[in-house]
Amino acid sequence: MQIKGYDIIGINIGKYSHNNNTAISLDCNEGVFATITVNLDENLDKDMAYLDTNNCSWVEDIMEKYCLGEPTGKYKQSGFCIYPLYKLDLKAIKELDNKIRK
């Protein structure tokens, strides 16, 4: 999987320490390529996350291309940015991670 000329070698699913919301980051050979989620002041279900479309303008295309989640139609503003809420397919994310780590 390539994004902006970088080979993505892993997908990490973790939690934000503040409220245990799901955090997702992508690794490349040089280290962490991007954290594609943002942690806003809202407790979410494990399979929900706001995507960082501000710093990762390509993230919704990746979610659609690899069937990793669906937009809920809900958005939340933080500062000057508005972030889309996605229902994540955690199983598909883990399967893609396993595939690209091989």
Predicted regions and their residues:
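OB-fold ssDNA-binding interfaces and closely related basic DNA-contact patches used
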Residues: 1-28
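Acidic, aromatic-enriched beta-alpha/helix-loop junctions
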Residues: 27-68
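Short, compact, well-ordered microdomains
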Residues: 53-102
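Generic intrinsically disordered, low-complexity segments enriched for polar/acidic and small residues
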Residues: 3, 13, 47, 72, ...
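Short, flexible beta-strand-to-coil junctions
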Residues: 25-32, 73-78
